[in-house]
Amino acid sequence: MRVRNRKGAGEMLAENAHIVVENPADFKGSWSERFGNDHPIHIEVGCGKGAFITGMAALHPEINYIAIDMQLSVLSYALDKAIEADLPNVQMMLVDGAALSEYFADGEIDQVYLNFSDPWPKGRHEKRRLTYKSFLATYEKILRPEGEIHFKTDNRGLFEYSLVSLANYGMELKKVWLDLHQDEEFAPQNVMTEYEQKFSQKGQVIYRLEAKFLPKK
């Protein structure tokens, strides 16, 4: 998600260091101490303006959430929502999702969310896709054994690519939705991103999958 530079975004993040972690590498292996409890930790890589992560945190106080984005202005809007909702189980990081192993110890994370990631449609940009094998290797490293990835997109090409990429990596596809909002059972519990709200109202099909890493043989 690309947004215009927001005046004062940097100062806003700095003034809310209790939510936005200034030096996240300092907490590698000790994120439970940062949260003050030993609840499961879920991360969203590319959090956008924060509707999903704050919505999930409000619904699941028994889970700790970390919102990750590399765009300063975007993260500042997510911070707005976290402050307004006064959620003790949300932290935020202004970092590149490709470097997650610098900030989390092996097996420290319970679940990864990838929502409406940049599809990078050109073949020469394949390695930038968040479901490319190098990213999957990073997720596997920081996730607990049999940890899961939950992925949503409106881009059919990226979804098809991701299905193949995850399968080739050896992951188990637990569930696949080819039209998420038509699932009467799941739709009521689906927490949407801002992007999803906008485009689903226009009739755009939303794809979703849940996959888990399997023990190495």
UniProtKB/Swiss-Prot annotation:
Documented EC number(s): 2.1.1.33
Annotated active site residues, numbered on this chain, are D118
The UniProt annotation places S-adenosyl-L-methionine binding at E44, D69, D96, D118
State the reactions this protein catalyses. Answer: guanosine(46) in tRNA + S-adenosyl-L-methionine = N(7)-methylguanosine(46) in tRNA + S-adenosyl-L-homocysteine
Pathway annotation from the record: tRNA modification; N(7)-methylguanine-tRNA biosynthesis
| Enzyme type, top EC level | transferase
User: InterPro entries attached here?
Assistant: SAM-dependent_MTases_sf, tRNA_(Gua-N-7)_MeTrfase_Trmb, tRNA_methyltr_TrmB_bact
Among Pfam families, the record links this protein to: Methyltransf_4
Residues covered by region (Interaction with RNA): 124-129
Swiss-Prot/TrEMBL keywords? Methyltransferase, S-adenosyl-L-methionine, Transferase, tRNA processing
Superkingdom of the organism of origin: Bacteria
Q: What does this protein do?
A: Catalyzes the formation of N(7)-methylguanine at position 46 (m7G46) in tRNA.
The entry's family comment says: Belongs to the class I-like SAM-binding methyltransferase superfamily. TrmB family.
Record protein name field? tRNA (guanine-N(7)-)-methyltransferase
What organism is this sequence from? Lactococcus lactis subsp. cremoris (strain SK11)
